[in-house]
Amino acid sequence: MVEFMIDRASGMPAYLQVVRQVREALRLGWLHPGDQLPTVRDVVASSGVNPNTVLKAYRELELVGLLEARQGAGTFVAATLGGSASPESLARLHHGLADWVRDAHAAGLEDEDIEALLRVVLTNTPLSGNGSGPNTKGESA
């Protein structure tokens, strides 16, 4: 089950942090259709946010078809996001990326620098192996 981490100093509204974290968990395969999300009461107890904040996040995710609220039963994942990478591939990539982030910090980069560099690489790295041209997937970083 996902546990939400709310960063009050981030400047991002708490409900958007919940939405982002659910979307990330879906994209990374940590949540699957049928999985139950924490109850509003549990999220409030663990994070200290207002119940309406959690309800707003869950409602927004329900409106786009990612969650399903079942009366008296809770909130469940209705759909997933992301590609078809295996859990093993995701774990390997996560480990490699964590090493890269540690190296970037050791080189003196701050989190914002790392995010900017990653956006540039995502935008300018070709999806095919031919090494020419920017990312042509049609998505922005």
Q: What are the residue ranges of the model-derived segments?
A:
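Short, cationic-aromatic polyanion-contact patches
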Residues: 15, 39, 73-90
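Beta-hairpin "wing" of winged helix-turn-helix
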Residues: 30-35, 62-72, 78-80
